[in-house]
Amino acid sequence: MLILNLGAGKQKPIIQDQTKEKPYFLINLDTAYYSTPEPGIIESLVMKWDRKESYISFCNEDAFTFMERTKLIFDRVCIYRLLEHISMDKVLYFIYLLSTITAKGDLIDVIVPNYEKLANMILKEDVNDKGFEAHNILLTTELLNDPSCPHASIWTSARAEYFFELEKRFKINQWATDFEFDGRNIYLRFLAERI
């Protein structure tokens, strides 16, 4: 199984633990990594991989550039807390690129802030509550984020279905609208299957 973890940071793909297929070759992709093997070298390693044991590689490359240039086809692509940083004018192109690095039946595993849940939290908040400061930090971070890495697109289950299924490349077949990740249960997780 070949897995791509986009915007990986230090997060391990959840789907890696859920798969019964062993061994796997995992490529963690993030521009925050120090020097790493060039994408071409990683592609060569994948081509030579004998599938007898698992292998993990790290790559310092922009997600768009990597997907535009790679010749690899991935069984799984994990996108955890990255998609909301893709601006709306690039979302459909990003999804198109995902379709070019997957084949029929392959899965895209996505975790994004669930803006429907965040909106409800705002509507029901009590500024006099003892936990308001923590509540405010969570909401401000997830809705606005730091200017150096702003959130540039809004995600709800309806929006995810609309954008991923619009061009008939993917079908969302699994949802979790109240998903807990990294200690917070404000996320939307879905699996989009390549069709």
Report the location of each language-model feature.
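Conserved SAM-binding loop
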Residues: 2-117, 190-195
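S-adenosyl-L-methionine-dependent methyltransferase catalytic module, highlighting the catalytic core
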Residues: 88-97, 107-195
